[in-house]
UniProtKB/Swiss-Prot annotation:
The active site is at residue 371. GO terms for molecular function: [isocitrate dehydrogenase (NADP+)] kinase activity; AMP binding; ATP binding; phosphoprotein phosphatase activity; protein serine/threonine kinase activity. Bifunctional enzyme which can phosphorylate or dephosphorylate isocitrate dehydrogenase (IDH) on a specific serine residue. This is a regulatory mechanism which enables bacteria to bypass the Krebs cycle via the glyoxylate shunt in response to the source of carbon. When bacteria are grown on glucose, IDH is fully active and unphosphorylated, but when grown on acetate or ethanol, the activity of IDH declines drastically concomitant with its phosphorylation. Keywords: ATP-binding, Cytoplasm, Glyoxylate bypass, Hydrolase, Kinase, Nucleotide-binding, Protein phosphatase, Serine/threonine-protein kinase, Transferase, Tricarboxylic acid cycle. Pfam families: AceK_kinase, AceK_regulatory. Its EC number is 2.7.11.5, 3.1.3.-. It comes from the Bacteria. This is Isocitrate dehydrogenase kinase/phosphatase. It is found in: Cytoplasm. Belongs to the AceK family. It catalyses: L-seryl-[isocitrate dehydrogenase] + ATP = O-phospho-L-seryl-[isocitrate dehydrogenase] + ADP + H(+).
Length: 574
């Protein structure tokens, strides 16, 4: 390779990232117009398009580099010099952290995810930690209640860029003040003030005002979801002011926000104060920088691994028929490997399973499907793997494992947030907790279905319970669109003997689903059956599912709320 080519390659990669993030911001900047026009299908399509941008631009850069190098092989010293030149370009670069991830992605695409060493990649950042502790330009505006909170909130709402008419601005402000007074008390509220992000956070059918409620005793989240009536008038649906509520709004089971963030590291740093339980990876994920979130997630894993003496073990719960799942006992994530061979009743391919996981990545997850990060050629030290898990890996996924002596390489896996399997949770709880779990499970099914997702396998073992008590679906190998399913009633038996026969007396085609059968496995436990019949009996009727299908086919997009119905102002104060 001729000398001097290293700088050209480094500049080409950074220019490629500039192009990618420019398109990312362009798609994001259209969120306000899509919201104001109530073009919910365009909202969904923009979300998919934005997710695809990253890989598309990585591919473009890879093709450019192959042209620049004429396809010649590169030696280790050349690659090190490329990284050195790239690193020198970053100190004054505003999106340095994601630029490093983009470099990693280009390298992995060129070299098939091999030789992933700190010398060649940005395994950890080259820049000072939390470089944007001091924000280089204001991300938020302060509002003080000099003339009372009604006046303050009127200024906040009047400053919003939204161009639609408000249904009843004074009413909404009254509800917010009432909530704040009940939460803080009159004296504390009088001594508090607001800091509000300059940009709205758009997701699904809502525009979120995100702020900080700065009180004498500390800083709280201040979140206002703004919705539209059927007549296109704006209203504020609730006010959320606890870290637990904010954590759910920014949760790992939800779609990414569309928020205009030319300085993503600064925005993440600003959000950290009101989302103290979120990792850096989760914060980047929430604002749509999912590829850099993957980088941060891997860094968090490495830091945890360096500081513990644990070994990987098989994850608790019923062993899956498609996935082998393992974890570190104290780590909050699980690792999922597609098995070489599936159980006989699972008539599908590994490619189908991967397609299902990609569907979930791109779809509106409505707070009920866990996000995943996908890795190739994932290296594990053998000393970190328990003997039982090593035997299981070799038994179930040997075709995906390469033995390097002291290490193994797993060709492909997913990393996902760890939860308590719902079947285990139901065994451990009783009373109100049991009732809440069954209510949550049914609500999860309903919300997935309304978003055009049919889970396929609805057994409790395929769902998990989060630290906030929410029920989330995490087993995607049988997932499909609601509109692809044929929901049928079981025909009446022709003769009494039909009900005793080992085979059904009616024909069953691929795609046929009989909701009446759900009762057999969801209500078998005498503690659970009555609760299910009380709260979710309609899930056992085919006409319920067909009615949902009709709404989806008619183009209806359901509202998705990241909070309980009882928290809505229309329920709470009316």
């Amino acid at each position: 390779m001729p000398r001097g080519l290293e700088l050209l390659i480094a500049q080409t990669i950074l220019q490629g990232f500039d192009a990618q993030y420019g398109r990312f911001l362009e798609v994001t900047s259209g969120a306000q117009q899509r919201f104001e026009q109530a073009d919910w299908h365009a909202v969904q399509q923009a979300m998919k398009n934005r997710i695809h941008l990253y890989d598309h631009h990585v591919g473009l850069v890879v093709e450019q580099l192959r042209c620049i190098t004429n396809g010649q092989s590169t030696d280790a010293a050349f690659l090190l010099r490329v990284k050195e030149h790239y690193t020198r370009l970053l100190p004054d670069y505003p999106r340095f952290e994601i630029a490093e991830s983009f470099f990693n992605s280009v390298y992995c695409r060129l070299f098939d995810h091999r030789s992933l060493t700190p010398e060649r990649l940005f395994i950890f950042s080259s820049q000072p930690e939390r470089r944007f502790r001091t924000i280089p330009r204001p991300l938020a505006k302060d509002f003080h209640p000099d003339h009372g909170w009604e006046s303050l909130l009127m200024r906040v709402i009047s400053d919003l860029p939204l161009r639609l008419r408000w249904q009843n601005k004074s009413r909404d402000i009254h509800y917010i003040v009432r909530h704040l007074t009940e939460t803080l008390g009159t004296d504390n509220l009088a001594e508090s003030h607001l800091q509000v992000a300059n940009e709205l956070f758009y997701r699904n059918k809502a525009a979120w005002l995100v702020g900080k409620l700065i009180t004498p005793s500390g800083t709280l989240p201040f979140l206002l979801p703004i919705h539209q009536t059927d007549d296109g008038e704006l209203f504020i649906d609730t006010c959320l002011t606890t870290t637990a509520e904010a954590s759910i709004v920014f949760g790992f089971a939800r779609s990414y926000f569309m928020v205009y963030a030319p300085l993503p590291a600064a925005l993440v740093e600003w959000l950290r104060e009101i989302l103290p339980g979120k990792t850096t990876a989760e914060l980047y994920m929430a604002i749509g920088c999912q590829k850099h979130a993957k980088t941060e997630s891997y860094r968090e894993y490495l830091v945890y691994l360096q500081g513990c003496n644990e070994q990987f073990i098989e994850a608790p719960g019923i062993r899956g028929m498609v996935m082998l799942v393992f974890t570190l006992p104290g780590f909050d994530r699980v690792f999922k490997v597609i098995k070489d061979r599936f159980a006989p009743q699972k008539e599908m391919s590994a490619a189908h399973v991967r397609a299902c996981y990609q569907l979930v990545k791109e779809h509106d997850r409505v707070g009920r499907m866990a996000d995943t990060q996908e890795f190739e050629n994932f290296v594990l030290e053998k000393r970190h793997i328990s003997p039982a898990l090593m035997a299981l890996l070799l038994q179930e996924a040997a075709e995906k494992i390469t033995d390097l002596g002291e290490q193994i390489v797993i060709r492909h896996l997913y990393i996902e947030r760890r939860m308590v399997p719902l079947n285990i949770w139901l065994e451990q709880v009783e009373g109100q907790q049991l009732r809440d779990a069954i209510e949550e499970y049914g609500n999860a099914i309903r919300q997935l279905a309304a978003a055009n997702i049919f889970p396929g396998d609805m057994l409790f073992k395929n769902f998990g319970v989060t630290r906030h008590g929410r029920v989330v679906f995490y087993d995607y190998d049988e997932i499909c669109y609601m509109t692809e399913v044929n929901f049928r009633d079981i025909p009446l038996p022709r003769y009494p003997e039909d009900e005793l026969a080992s085979e059904p007396w009616y024909s069953v085609s691929p795609g046929d689903v009989f909701p009446e059968e759900f009762r057999h496995w969801l209500c078998a436990d005498p503690r659970i059956g009555p609760l299910f019949e009380e709260m979710h009996a309609d899930l056992f009727r085919a006409d319920y599912w067909r009615a949902l299908q009709n709404r989806i086919r008619e183009g209806h997009v359901e509202d998705v709320y990241a909070y309980r119905r009882r928290q809505r102002f229309s329920v709470r104060f009316v």
